[in-house]
């Protein structure tokens, strides 16, 4: 009986150690011009699981990534990268994260990260006040994800 308990404990420890190895890294490029127009994240819709990392890469100069106030899951920490620097975000909280390029937000440069299934805060993000061009691009991003 004791050997069985030890084997289960060892299996549990191995499973916990292997979990980070299963995490995915998703690259997102920050571009002056992309398939969807000017000032874009590609992809603009990112599907991730808790524990995954999202690496934002400023392919063109002048970009960063920043969380938008009240448009990330409850319990998630806000973040902001420096201009022209790669930024690695580990997503831990399930839900939707709306992010922006700070200098180009007024031009609609946003991306949506959906962590887990059916992000609970997506309706809140969609209905929140934001510039018209941002709302239009967000609606396109959501439609492309379906």
Swiss-Prot record:
Keyword terms of this UniProt record: Copper, Electron transport, Metal-binding, Periplasm, Signal, Transport
Indicate where this protein is primarily found: periplasm
Q: What SUPFAM superfamilies is this protein classified in?
A: Cupredoxins (SSF49503)
Per its record, what triggers expression of this gene product?
Under anaerobic growth conditions and by nitrite.
| CDD domains linked to this entry | Pseudoazurin
An annotated Gene Ontology molecular function: copper ion binding
Which positions are annotated as binding Cu cation?
63, 101, 104, 109
Give the location in the cell: Periplasm
Quick one: signal sequence residues? 1-23
Per the entry, which co-factors are needed?
Cu cation
Query: How is the co-factor bound, per the entry?
Result: Binds 1 copper ion per subunit.
Q: Which domain of life is it from?
A: Bacteria
Q: Where is the Plastocyanin-like domain?
A: 28-116
Annotated Gene Ontology cellular components are: periplasmic space
Q: What does this protein do?
A: This soluble electron transfer copper protein is required for the inactivation of copper-containing nitrite reductase in the presence of oxygen. Serves as a direct electron donor to the nitrite reductase.
- What is this protein called in UniProt? Pseudoazurin
Name the species this protein comes from.
Alcaligenes faecalis
Q: What is the lineage of its organism?
A: Bacteria, Pseudomonadati, Pseudomonadota, Betaproteobacteria, Burkholderiales
């Amino acid at each position: 009986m004791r050997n069985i308990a030890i084997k289960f404990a060892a299996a549990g420890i191995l499973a916990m150690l292997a979990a980070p190895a299963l995490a995915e890294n998703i690259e997102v490029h920050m571009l002056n011009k992309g398939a969807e127009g000017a000032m874009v994240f590609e992809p603009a819709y990112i599907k991730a699981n808790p524990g995954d990392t999202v690496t934002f890469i400023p392919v063109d100069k002048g970009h960063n990534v920043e969380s938008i106030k009240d448009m990330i899951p409850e319990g998630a920490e806000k973040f902001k990268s420096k201009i022209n620097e790669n930024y690695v975000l580990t997503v831990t909280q399930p839900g939707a994260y709306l992010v922006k390029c700070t200098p180009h937000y007024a031009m609609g440069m946003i991306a949506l990260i959906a962590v887990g299934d059916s992000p609970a805060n997506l309706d809140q993000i969609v209905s929140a006040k934001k510039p018209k061009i941002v709302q239009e691009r967000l609606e396109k991003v959501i439609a492309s994800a379906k």
